Structures are given as structure tokens and as C-alpha cells.
Amino acid sequence: MKTLVNAETNKSVSEFIEAIANQKRKADSKELLEIIQKITGKEPKIWGVGIVGFGKYSYQRKNGDEFEWFNVGFSPGKAHLTVYVMYDINEEKDLLAKLGKHKTGRGCLYLKSLADIDINVLKKIIAKSDRWR
């Protein structure tokens, strides 16, 4: 099995969160950490240098390379909080319409703040990602 640049590490999640300079981003990260852990029942792990991931599964690319990745995760970036899900979030038109202020990628949500969204809708998205694999 090959190793990704953003592979699971043994780094401390609490130290990672405490090192976030932006206090609002730190508070949102602590809240999101608690929410995802409660939904998934899984311990958080640092993946790469800046992703907090929950759960783990193996997948194989079309070229045959096999990797491990997390079921759901987040990254507290400077511009936004990114929530990673393991399915095409753009297929969730009904949930996204109710979520609040956000942007999307194929497998991620970009949030400025948890205060801008409906947390219960986010919880449904997180739960679906956790069950996806």
C-alpha cells in the first residue's frame, strides 16, 4: 500500500487545535471536533500536516494504487474551515439549500464560520459521510 502525503500521523490533535492562532477558528474547530466525534464514535487523528480525520478505510485507484483515507474530517484553514466528506456533496441539493452560508467542492464544504450554518444540517451530512464506506 502506498503512503499519501496526507497520511495518518501520530501528532496530537489537541496540540494541533490549540496552536490555531485565530480564536474564532479555534473555537469552531473545537466544536466541530466534538460534533464529529459524537456522531462517528471514532477518535480523531491528524492526517498530513493539517487535517483532522475520523475513521479509516482503504480504497484503490483505477491505476491499482491502494491508499488509506478517513471517513470524515476537517481542516481549519486561514480563509475557511473545510469539512471533508467521502461522497459528492453537490448531490445533496436539499441539505445544501438548508445549510446556510457555504461553498462546495466535490467532496468538501467550505465554511467561514459555524455560526453561519445550521448545525443540524451539517450533522446529517457528517453522519452520511461516516456511513458511506
Where are the predicted features?
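Charge-dense, helix-prone N-terminal extensions
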Residues: 1-133
